[in-house]
Amino acid sequence: MRLKSIITVIALILIMFMSAIESSIISLALPTIKQDLNAGNLISLIFTAYFIALVIANPIVGELLSRFKIIYVAIAGLLLFSIGSFMCGLSTNFTMLIISRVIQGFGSGVLMSLSQIVPKLAFEIPLRYKIMGIVGSVWGISSIIGPLLGGGILEFATWHWLFYINIPIAIIAIILVIWTFHFPEEETVAKSKFDTKGLTLFYVFIGLIMFALLNQQLLLLNFLSFILAIVVAMCLFKVEKHVSSPFLPVVEFNRSITLVFITDLLTAICLMGFNLYIPVYLQEQLGLSPLQSGLVIFPLSVAWITLNFNLHRIEAKLSRKVIYLLSFTLLLVSSIIISFGIKLPVLIAFVLILAGLSFGYIYTKDSVIVQEETSPLQMKKMMSFYGLTKNLGASIGSTIMGYLYAIQSGIFGPNLHNVLSAVAVISIGLIVLWVVFFKEQSSQSKE
């Protein structure tokens, strides 16, 4: 690779690292923050506020990128994240901390969308597969580095420095972005009219979905929220079909793209089961340290990267449908094997290689399909909504898997069995979905 390409990759890694490490590094300091700021039972708002802001920011990035150069949007996202981090570090009360986390979340939403769009503009296949594998694996690697870095900082400094550490990283990222984020093929359509009605309906839809996910008081309200969300979605679809430059380009959702979005949503739910609750199980039930549990999970990231470095060779021999079905089968098999070897960390680590191969293909290929099979003018918007789909899947996954993990031993056995059973059911559902709905096209048969 040329020097500029290498610098672009480093910038993407730093951008993803800042977003990915937030949860794992902050979670260690929750007891201290709770005591210092007298947060009480509201302490979970640290994550909730961040996630809500991230979800709000995700889809608007596509609209911004259709009007402004990516370099300006990237710098704005990094500045928002840096300002939010700095304010978090300065926080002297819980209200200020939550406001700061919202600002930080807005910045993170911008950065996460860019990590899906920049590879398309900067790299051609098969190099793009490798780059996306490296960038995507940052999530897994951060699960190890986060506790280690966070523990080291808390050993010698206060929790405020967990936020300050982002600032020098962001400054380096801004310098690299200014240097490398110049793409000749980048297109903007700044003269188009802003789709206010579409944006309003979309955020009403997202608000209803998020309320249904986060509300834990009256389940009836959750049900009503989902019903209203469906009604709003139908109105949104009808409105956006007749807009020249829609906020949500519904005409892009053909059979293939729709299938990819559904696949990514369900896969994100499964990934949360592995990434969040296998480490929790290893620590709570088997007595491993955070670092040891992170090392058990690490093979998933290694397999993820390895698969992407060889993906173009695999696609030369097998069709898209076959590889997807193999990926879902690997996910199913890995969940079953871990269920039988649930008390053996070494076996779990080995089997997570299979899961890593599965996640590596699904996430990377889903992203590339959206990049390549949507119209050039709508690609940035579609990638922003694709990122939103992953984040919603992660939120739904953390909620559902958390509920299943909280169920004590019963017909499913130890509580991790409940999570693994859910992954197995989703894997079977994905297999059925692709067998029934995917139709191979001649251009896709040997990618």
Curated annotation (Swiss-Prot):
Domain of life: Bacteria
Cited PROSITE patterns: MFS (PS50850)
Gene3D superfamilies in the cross-refs: MFS general substrate transporter like domains, Multidrug resistance protein D
Cited Pfam families: MFS_1
NCBIfam families assigned: MFS_effux_SdrM
Protein family: Belongs to the major facilitator superfamily.
Protein name from the UniProt record: Multidrug efflux pump SdrM
Organism: Staphylococcus aureus (strain N315)
